[in-house]
């Protein structure tokens, strides 16, 4: 008789917050796309009446802001969790990796805050 084959538990990729950081940055860019997009195009030399149509994302801005803040919260929670929550062989247990993720988190958080606040200071540029 043959023994039934035991399936090994599948190892999942270690969760380290990269996805949440990316989602937060993308949502912040989308939240400010209605206001930042025309200014960037004008600064690059593009012009025309069609630039006024780029405000189509304005009604969705609160949703994108909420998504950016939620993603940043989950990234912060994942990155700043205690080292004891990491198993010894995982990437998050390595101090250099943890320091790099913290640095990247604060850079992304600053960029998110700048892009979220940009629509409020944009009138000073026109």
Curated annotation (Swiss-Prot):
Annotated Gene Ontology cellular components are: plasma membrane
Bilayer-crossing regions: 26-46, 54-74, 104-124
Coiled-coil regions, chain positions: none
Which InterPro entries does its entry note?
A: Transprt_MerT
What membrane topology is annotated for this entry?
Multi-pass membrane protein
Has the keyword Nucleotide-binding been applied to this entry?
A: no
Quote the record's binding site residues for Hg(2+): 34-35, 86, 92
Keywords noted in UniProt: Cell inner membrane, Cell membrane, Membrane, Mercuric resistance, Mercury, Metal-binding, Plasmid, Transmembrane, Transmembrane helix, Transport
What GO molecular function annotation could you give as one example from this UniProt entry? Answer: mercury ion transmembrane transporter activity
Q: Where in the cell is it found?
A: Cell inner membrane
**Which NCBIfam families does the entry link to?**
PRK13751.2
Q: Tell me the protein family, please.
A: Belongs to the MerT family.
Q: What does this protein do, in the record's words? A: Involved in mercury resistance. Probably transfers a mercuric ion from the periplasmic Hg(2+)-binding protein MerP to the cytoplasmic mercuric reductase MerA.
Put simply, this protein is called: Mercuric transport protein MerT
Tell me which species this is from. Enterobacter agglomerans (Erwinia herbicola)
């Amino acid at each position: 008789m043959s023994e039934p084959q035991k399936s090994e538990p599948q190892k999942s990729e270690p969760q380290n917050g990269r996805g949440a950081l990316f989602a937060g940055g993308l949502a912040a860019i989308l939240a400010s796309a209605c206001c930042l997009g025309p200014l960037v195009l004008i600064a690059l030399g593009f012009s025309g009446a069609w630039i006024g149509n780029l405000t189509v994302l304005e009604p969705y801005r609160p949703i994108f802001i909420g998504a950016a803040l939620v993603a940043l919260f989950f990234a912060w929670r994942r990155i700043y969790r205690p080292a004891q929550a990491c198993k010894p062989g995982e990437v998050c247990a390595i101090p250099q990796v943890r320091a790099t993720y913290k640095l990247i988190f604060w850079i992304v958080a600053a960029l998110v805050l700048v892009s979220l606040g940009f629509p409020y200071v944009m009138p000073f540029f026109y």
